[in-house]
Design a protein with these regions (language model features):
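Membrane-proximal helix-turn-helix segments that form the acceptor-binding/catalytic region
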Residues: 3-25
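Short beta-strand->alpha-helix junction loop in the catalytic core
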Residues: 31-32, 47-59, 112
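Conserved donor-binding/catalytic core segment of Leloir-type glycosyltransferases
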Residues: 65-84, 90-95, 106
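Glycosyltransferase donor-sugar binding loop
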Residues: 104-122, 139
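Nucleotide-activated donor-binding/catalytic signature segment of Leloir-type glycosyltransferases, i.e.
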Residues: 119-141
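Aromatic "clamp/platform" in nucleotide-sugar-dependent glycosyltransferases that forms part
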Residues: 160-161
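Conserved acidic donor-binding segment of nucleotide-sugar-dependent glycosyltransferases
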Residues: 194-203, 212-216
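A charged, aromatic-enriched C-terminal amphipathic alpha-helix characteristic of glycosyltransferases
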Residues: 214-264
């Protein structure tokens, strides 16, 4: 639904044709399920988050210790395209760093260089990097180097306009980051309200940062990768057992665990 949406005028009929043959559809969040229902999809739709294998991800950063002291760093890892709202990120970053002189802000990418389909954003980002030494752009990171960033930073920031769960939030919380995310799209389903800011509002975003920093509590966010790993296992369970009753791991975590334990115990 996400990337093919602009092609819906000719592709939707093809998708609905496949829908008639499918015994189930996996999506990350309830809002995605609702959008598919509105578009005419009739197959069972299971909300299973994204298929994160927590153990495999943790193995990529064997030095990670959740008890280690963390640095006063905000990490931003989303693409710099329009749907991620990067100009807003830059505005927030500049204001945040002005208010918090003991903090740094890292923008990361695994690419050899930063890319964007949004005109002007790369120039604006590098201009901010020149005038604000605590705003740092980091490119060509390996997965291990990225995970090392997450395991030492305190907060992952997001400004996306259309994410369905988001890999950034799952990987960040797996490695102990707290989060500041927009109260938008799929995020309110699983992120606590006190970590969500009013979309497009810089002042409210800064207040949310202040609250998250002051509380210093990421116990709620540690649940995200656990539930997502559970969702990955539920995908296998649903396929293996031809399970046609719709499941939502965000809402039925205990029931999903029960089904998996029941299967394991025979």
């Amino acid at each position: 639904y996400d990337f093919v949406y602009p092609m819906r005028s000719w592709m939707r009929g093809f998708e609905l044709g496949l829908d008639k043959r499918m015994t189930g559809i996996f999506v990350g969040s309830t809002i995605h399920k609702e959008q598919l229902r509105q578009a005419g999809f009739e197959a069972p739709i299971h909300v299973v988050s994204l298929p994160l294998h927590a153990e495999m991800a943790l193995d990529k950063n064997p030095k990670y210790n959740p008890l280690d002291q963390r640095q006063n760093t905000v990490v931003y890892s989303s693409r710099l395209d329009k749907e991620k709202n990067p100009f807003f990120m830059l505005e927030v970053a500049e204001a945040f760093l002005a208010d918090n002189p003991n903090w740094t802000w890292h923008v990361t990418t695994s690419g050899k260089e930063f890319k964007s389909s949004l005109p002007g954003v790369l120039g604006a980002m590098h201009e901010l990097e020149k005038r604000q030494p605590r705003f740092v752009c980091m490119h060509n990171l390996t997965k291990q180097e990225y995970y090392e960033q997450l395991s030492t930073a305190r907060i992952q920031f997001n400004s996306a306009l259309q994410d369905y769960v988001s890999w950034t939030v799952l990987e960040a919380t797996l490695f102990g980051c707290d989060v500041v995310y927009p109260n938008f799209r799929s995020f309110p389903e699983f992120i606590p309200q006190d970590k969500l800011y009013q979309p497009f509002d810089v002042n409210d975003c800064l207040k949310t940062f202040d609250h998250v920093i002051e509380r210093g509590n990421n116990f709620q966010t540690m649940r995200f990768p656990i539930v997502s790993d559970l969702g990955r296992q539920m995908e296998g369970y649903i396929i293996a057992n031809d399970y046609d009753k719709e499941i939502n791991v965000w809402h039925e975590e205990a029931y999903c665990k029960h089904l998996l334990e029941q299967e394991q115990n025979g």
